[in-house]
Regions:
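Internal alpha-helical scaffold of NAD(P)-dependent oxidoreductase catalytic cores
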Residues: 149, 153-223, 227-262
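NAD(P)-dependent Rossmann-like dehydrogenase/reductase catalytic/cofactor-binding core
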Residues: 234-371
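Rossmann-like NAD(P)-binding element
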Residues: 59-100, 105-108
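Conserved hydrophobic residues forming the short capping helix/wall of the S-adenosyl-L-methionine
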Residues: 50, 124-125, 248, 317
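Nucleotide donor/acceptor-binding cores
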Residues: 7-9, 105, 133, 160
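Rossmann-like NAD(P)(H) cofactor-binding subdomain of soluble oxidoreductases
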Residues: 87-151
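NAD(P)+-binding Rossmann beta1-loop-alpha1 motif at the extreme N-terminus of oxidoreductases
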Residues: 2-56
Length: 371
């Protein structure tokens, strides 16, 4: 690590597969890493090994200098704190971080889902955080890999295109140079509407689960993308995708269609979305080879992607008077199927700090910050 502007010491919060992705890439690259999780069983073998073994052409050993359930030693002196916990836990993590943060630190959400940076900013403020910290978010996980054991992974593919945004957007010029050496494929986005509306998980996961609910609940272990995305499911993808792009455009954000996103990120574009999903599964380097089928509808593909993805997209559509009938239908069907009212607990305009304002004012908030 030679760039004087970039982060040197990085704390990763969340020791799931997303956290291991980051340890593998950043540790081999020479960044000083700390790892935190509330579950010590996820940390003990990494702590005993002193890091993670990474297979492959650019593999090696990724050392972790601290692996702890205690946030204070995990974050003390860190330049960047990367939160890889899933969208539903981001506010909880922010409240725990609030008294420990120091001026100049950057919190990076991987991923921000839709509105993550706003949620974290409000949580820090509500918890009385006085430190001057920056908040950034990425639109997706940067890598795909196989976990061979608790301390050994094999990378599959690096995403070719990622976006990083800050909240407020006017901080990107200061923050991006510190983060770009960690993620060379990333580009700076003008604000968090760009990253939030490039939330592919919300597009891909919920519709597939709803359309294949019978298979999921009967225990059919189908290939989630190659077999789950039929022509009808692909048309549903297209419908919710068109609404996502339209709401983003009404807020001044230009975001890629689903087909364009697949091509930018993975270099794959089939004649149809069905073909694209099959190639992403069956190609030798296909990132979806190991995508598991949910065992029930009580799965993060629903419990995370509805409240932190579809709910805020629908709410922002209402604020800009852009209809989202397909997204709204999915939300209602999920409520009926699961009995969970995700609209009541999700990222509403009120929770985002955007209630009572129109699209132009929302654009001002994401550029300049909450007042």
């Amino acid at each position: 690590v030679t760039d004087e502007n970039c982060a040197k010491t990085v704390t990763i919060i969340g020791a799931g597969i997303g956290g291991l992705y980051l340890i593998a890439e950043l540790g081999v690259a020479g960044f000083k890493l700390r790892l935190h999780d509330i579950d010590d069983s996820k940390l003990s073998e990494i702590r005993g090994r002193g890091g993670v073994d990474v297979e492959g052409e650019k593999g090696g050993f990724a050392p972790v200098e601290r692996a702890t359930t205690d946030l204070e030693p995990a974050t003390d002196g860190a330049d960047v704190i990367i939160v890889v916990t899933g969208g539903n836990a981001q506010a909880v993590v922010a409240r725990s971080l609030a008294p420990l943060l120091r001026d100049g630190q950057v919190i990076l959400l991987i991923q921000g889902n839709t509105g993550g940076s706003l949620i974290v900013r409000r949580a820090l403020d509500d918890a009385g955080c006085r430190a001057e910290v920056d908040i950034a978010e990425m639109d997706n996980y940067p890598y795909s890999c196989w976990r061979l054991s608790p301390t050994r992974i094999r990378p599959i593919v690096r995403k070719r295109w990622l976006q990083i945004a800050t909240f407020p957007g006017n901080r990107i010029g200061e923050v991006f140079p510190r983060l770009s050496p960690l993620f060379p494929e990333a580009v700076a986005a003008p604000n968090c509407l760009y990253t939030g509306f490039t939330n592919a998980n919300a597009m891909l996961h919920v519709a597939n689960c709803v359309a294949n609910a019978g298979r999921i609940e009967s225990g059919d272990s189908y290939k989630f993308y190659a077999e789950g995305v039929t022509p009808g499911v692909a048309r549903l993808y297209e419908a919710i995708n068109a609404e996502r792009v339209a709401v983003a455009a009404a807020l001044g954000a230009s975001v890629p269609t689903l087909a364009d996103w697949f091509e930018r990120v993975y270099g794959v574009r089939g004649a149809t979305l069905v073909e694209t999903c099959q190639r992403l599964t069956y190609n030798s380097d296909g990132p979806y080879q190991e995508t598991g089928t949910p065992k029930s509808l009580d799965h993060k593909f629903i419990t995370e992607d509805v409240p932190t993805g579809l709910i805020p997209m629908s709410a922002l559509g209402a604020a800009t008077r852009v209809g989202t009938p397909a997204i709204d239908a999915l939300i209602e069907i999920v409520r009926s199927m699961t009995g969970n009212d995700f609209a009541a607990e999700g990222r509403t305009l009120g929770r985002l700090g955007l209630s009572g304002i129109d699209g132009l004012e929302i654009r001002h908030v994401v550029e300049e910050g909450l007042t």
